[in-house]
Amino acid sequence: MSRPEQQFKKVLKNPQAQYAVYPTVKVERISTTEHSYFIATKPMFEGGRRNNVFLGQQIRQSVVFKYVSKKEIPGNEVIVMKALQDTPGIIKLIEYTENAMYYILIIEYIPNSVDLLHYHYFKKLEENEAKKIMFQLILIIQNIYEKGFIHGDIKDENLIIDIKQKMIKVIDFGSAVRLNEDHPQYNMFGTWEYVCPEFYYYGYYYQLPLTVWTIGMVAVNLFRFRAENFYLNDILKGENYIPDHISETGKQFITDCLTINENKRLSFKGLVSHPWFKGLKKEIQPISELGVDYKNVIT
């Protein structure tokens, strides 16, 4: 066994190796034109939609491998991630390779992080923390918009948060598409539970009102336990989805985002100037510049 492989197995034995990666997992080697990697053969997330994501390592830097089936998505995720490479708040694509069946994306690994769904698994967030998370998300989404793309699947699972620094990054660009804000869209690529009501009613939607709707859904769910996640059907049934314990401006933000009539919904460009976010700085500080030392991931 080579020394790099021994080092990687030390990472897998570390309790902070995250999720479903265990010390007994087997390790394989993958080579690209640029680097050679070791990869765990057990997914980071077992079951569900993300059993195609694996922890890996190149020399002394941990990375994440994502396998994208060529049958499902014709390389769009790679194209979008390359175009957004320098965008703050976006998970970075280090490089990619492919085989007969898959595009293999090699993505940066953020230590001490978890997806937002698991972050509020057993707790409802305090309003101030939730507000800062939502403001970061809006700034990141607007940066994506300015580059000419729409993420297409904004939800708790596609946001990771650095537990110590409370900074977030957007992941999973498998549903991302080119911005086409003036034309109706007839295909839905995102998660059905987060679909906007107009798609159910009319069979089409516009990209920006859909984005505002999904932002509102994320905001509601931050104030709930994971098992209580709220979806469109709950709203259409008339159930009260506004948290009682938050400020009036917080309640108004959620109401403005989750208005059934898309023409009365908060505008995409009006998100950042909503009174709920008064006093917050309009900047995104990358996690990688906040003290994360990838060389110290291996102990």
Curated annotation (Swiss-Prot):
Active site: 153 (proton acceptor)
Residue span, Protein kinase domain: 39-277
Main location: virion
EC numbers, comma separated: 2.7.11.1
UniProt subcellular location: Virion; Host cytoplasm
Classification via PANTHER family: PROTEIN KINASE DOMAIN-CONTAINING PROTEIN, SERINE/THREONINE-PROTEIN KINASE PIM
Protein name (Swiss-Prot/TrEMBL): Serine/threonine-protein kinase 1
